[in-house]
C-alpha cells in the first residue's frame, strides 16, 4: 500500500516540517475549519446582513469564481481547445468578432473540412450565436476568447443568487450563489472549455427568476427580463428554448407579461433568421440542419431515421458519423438513459445528496411540484437524443440549485447541525481539490486526477502530461517566424481527435491547418500560399510528429 503514489505523498518531503503537498492542503483546511466553527454565530449574522444587499452580493458572487480561476493560471493556463466542439465555437466567436454572421466559402475549402464546420455555401460553425457572442466579446475586449467564458461563469453565479431571491429568503439565496461558485466556477468544465453552458444557465436564471416575480408584482421590468432570458436561450440552445416556453406557460405567467416577453424576444428571432440566411442560404434552415444533411452529423433523435451524408466525409467526420450511428436507435435506449445518471452529479456536490430527501414533503404545494415538473420536461426533452452532456440542461442549473437550497432549508428545521455538517463537507470538498490544483504539484495532480470527478478542470491544460500533444505543437509553431501551413496526416488506425482548427479569415491567419490530400493536391495549396512555411503533422504518433513538409 505504501508504494501507491498517493500514500507516498504523505511521507516526509524536503521541507522543515516534513510535509508533502497533501499535508499542507489538509493543514490549511483544518486551520480554516477551526477558525470558522467558533465564529459561526458571527459569520451567520454578517451573512444575513449581506444577503439582503442585492447589488453587493451579485458583484461579489460574479467576481468570486473569476478571481479563484485567475489564481490558478500559473499552473493551469488559459484552456487549450481540444475537441471539435471547441474549435467550432471558437470559429463562431472569431466570425462574430469580424462583425459578420458567416464567412465567404474558401476556394480550396476541401483542405479545411472539419467536424461541426460548414464549408458551403458559406464557411461557418454549425452552432447558434449565443456562446459565440460571449467568445467574440472576450476576443474584442480582452484579445482572449476565454475571457468571455470566465465572465459568463461569473454572471451565472451572480444571477443564480438573483433568481433564488424570488424563491427563498436572502440568506439561503446567498448560500445558493456560493454553491454555484464552487460547483460551476474555477474547477468546472464550463469554466475550462469553449463549449458553453454558462450562457444557457444565465438564460435559465432570468426566466426562472422572472416568473415568480411576475406572479407577485407583474412588473414590466420582470417581463422584459423574461423575454431576454428566452431570447438568450433561443440564441444558445433553440430546442431547449421550446421547453422553457412550455414551462413558462405551465407556471401560469400572466398573458400581458408573456406578450411583453414575446416582443422582447423578436430581435433574437431576427438574428436567428439572419444567421440562417447568411450561413445556409435559407431563412428557415438552421446551420445545424444543413450540417446534418451534408455530413450526417450531428445525429437525429432516437425515434428518427439515421441521417445520411450527402457529401464525402473526412476521416474524422467518418469516425464521428460511425460513432453516432452506433448509439442511435431504440436498441440500447434504456442503457443510455441509465448511463446519464452520472451526469447529474455535475449539478450536485456529493454531500448535498444527503439533504435531498427533505425536499420531498414540499411537493404537496404546486409551486414546488412545478420545479420537479420543469426538471422532468428538460429530462424528457433530452431523453430521446442519443448523446447527453450537462450543458444540454444548463438552463435548469438554477432549478437544481433551488432544490438543494430548499432541501437544506427544510432540513435545518429538523437539525441545524446536519445542515452545518453538509455545508462544511461541501466546502472541504471544494477546498481540497482547489488546493490540489493551486499547489501545482505535478506528481500530485497526476496521481490524484483519476479520483477527481469527471467534470473537473482539465489537468492537462497546464502541460503536465499534454497527452494529445497539442500544447507542444502549438508552442513549436508559435516559435517559428512568419506564416505557417500545417498539413495534417492521420494514420489509418486513428488515435487522435480533430486537429483542423482554422480561424474565420483563413488566408490571413498566422497558422493554417489543412488536411493532407496527397502530394499532388497539397502542391496546389502550397502554391496558393507561397509565403508560408509548410509542415507535415502526424497527430497519431506518440508524441505527435511535426516535421518540415518534404520538398518535391
Regions found by a protein language model. Give the residues of each.
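Hydrophobic/aromatic-rich transmembrane helices and adjacent perimembrane loops
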Residues: 90, 190, 197, 236, ...
Amino acid at each position: 500500500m505504501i508504494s501507491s503514489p498517493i500514500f507516498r505523498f504523505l511521507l516526509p518531503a524536503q521541507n522543515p516540517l516534513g510535509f508533502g503537498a497533501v499535508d499542507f492542503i489538509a493543514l490549511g483546511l483544518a486551520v480554516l475549519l477551526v477558525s470558522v466553527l467558533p465564529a459561526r454565530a458571527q459569520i451567520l449574522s454578517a451573512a444575513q446582513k449581506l444577503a439582503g444587499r442585492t447589488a453587493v452580493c451579485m458583484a461579489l458572487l460574479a467576481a468570486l469564481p473569476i478571481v479563484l480561476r485567475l489564481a490558478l493560471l500559473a499552473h493551469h493556463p488559459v484552456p487549450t481547445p481540444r475537441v471539435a466542439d471547441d474549435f467550432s465555437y471558437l470559429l463562431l466567436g472569431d466570425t462574430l468578432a469580424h462583425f459578420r454572421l458567416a464567412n465567404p466559402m474558401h476556394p480550396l475549402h476541401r483542405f479545411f473540412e472539419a467536424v461541426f464546420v460548414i464549408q458551403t455555401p458559406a464557411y461557418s460553425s454549425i452552432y447558434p450565436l449565443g456562446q459565440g457572442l460571449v467568445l467574440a466579446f472576450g476576443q474584442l475586449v480582452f484579445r482572449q476568447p476565454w475571457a468571455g467564458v470566465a465572465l459568463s461563469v461569473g454572471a451565472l453565479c451572480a444571477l443564480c443568487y438573483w433568481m433564488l431571491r424570488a424563491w427563498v429568503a436572502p440568506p439561503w439565496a446567498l448560500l445558493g450563489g456560493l454553491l454555484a461558485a464552487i460547483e460551476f466556477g474555477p474547477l468546472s468544465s464550463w469554466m475550462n472549455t469553449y463549449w458553453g453552458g454558462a450562457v444557457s444557465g444565465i438564460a435559465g436564471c432570468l426566466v426562472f427568476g422572472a416568473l415568480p416575480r411576475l406572479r407577485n408584482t407583474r412588473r414590466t421590468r420582470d417581463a422584459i427580463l423574461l423575454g431576454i432570458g428566452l431570447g438568450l436561450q433561443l440564441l444558445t440552445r433553440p430546442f431547449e428554448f421550446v421547453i422553457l416556453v412550455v414551462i413558462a406557460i405551465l407556471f401560469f405567467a400572466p398573458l400581458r407579461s408573456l406578450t411583453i416577453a414575446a416582443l422582447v424576444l423578436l430581435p433574437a428571432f431576427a438574428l436567428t433568421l439572419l444567421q440562417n440566411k447568411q450561413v445556409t442560404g435559407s431563412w428557415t434552415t438552421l446551420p445545424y440542419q444543413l450540417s446534418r444533411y451534408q455530413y450526417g452529423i450531428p445525429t437525429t433523435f432516437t425515434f428518427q431515421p439515421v441521417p445520411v451524408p450527402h457529401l464525402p466525409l473526412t476521416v474524422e467526420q467518418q469516425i464521428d458519423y460511425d460513432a453516432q450511428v452506433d448509439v442511435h436507435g431504440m436498441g440500447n435506449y434504456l442503457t443510455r438513459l441509465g448511463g446519464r445518471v452520472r451526469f447529474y452529479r455535475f449539478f450536485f456536490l456529493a454531500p448535498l445528496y444527503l439533504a435531498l430527501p427533505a425536499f420531498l414533503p414540499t411537493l404537496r404545494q404546486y409551486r414546488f411540484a412545478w420545479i420537479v415538473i420543469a426538471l422532468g420536461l428538460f429530462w424528457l426533452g433530452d431523453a430521446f437524443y442519443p448523446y447527453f452532456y450537462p450543458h444540454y440542461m444548463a438552463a435548469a442549473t438554477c432549478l437544481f440549485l433551488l432544490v438543494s437550497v430548499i432541501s437544506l432549508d427544510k432540513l435545518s428545521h429538523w437539525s441545524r447541525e446536519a445542515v452545518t455538517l453538509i455545508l462544511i463537507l461541501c466546502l472541504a470538498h471544494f477546498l481540497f481539490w482547489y488546493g490540489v490544483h493551486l499547489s501545482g504539484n505535478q506528481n500530485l495532480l497526476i496521481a490524484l486526477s483519476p479520483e477527481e470527478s469527471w467534470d473537473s478542470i482539465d489537468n492537462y491544460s497546464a502541460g503536465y502530461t499534454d497527452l494529445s500533444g497539442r500544447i507542444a505543437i502549438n508552442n513549436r509553431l508559435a516559435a517559428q517566424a512568419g506564416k505557417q501551413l500545417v498539413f495534417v496526416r492521420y494514420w489509418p488506425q486513428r488515435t487522435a481527435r480533430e486537429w483542423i482548427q482554422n480561424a474565420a479569415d483563413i488566408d490571413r491567419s498566422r497558422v493554417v491547418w489543412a488536411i493532407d490530400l496527397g502530394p499532388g493536391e497539397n502542391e496546389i495549396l502550397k502554391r496558393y500560399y507561397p509565403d508560408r512555411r509548410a509542415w507535415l503533422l502526424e497527430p497519431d504518433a506518440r508524441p505527435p510528429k511535426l516535421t518540415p513538409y518534404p520538398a518535391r
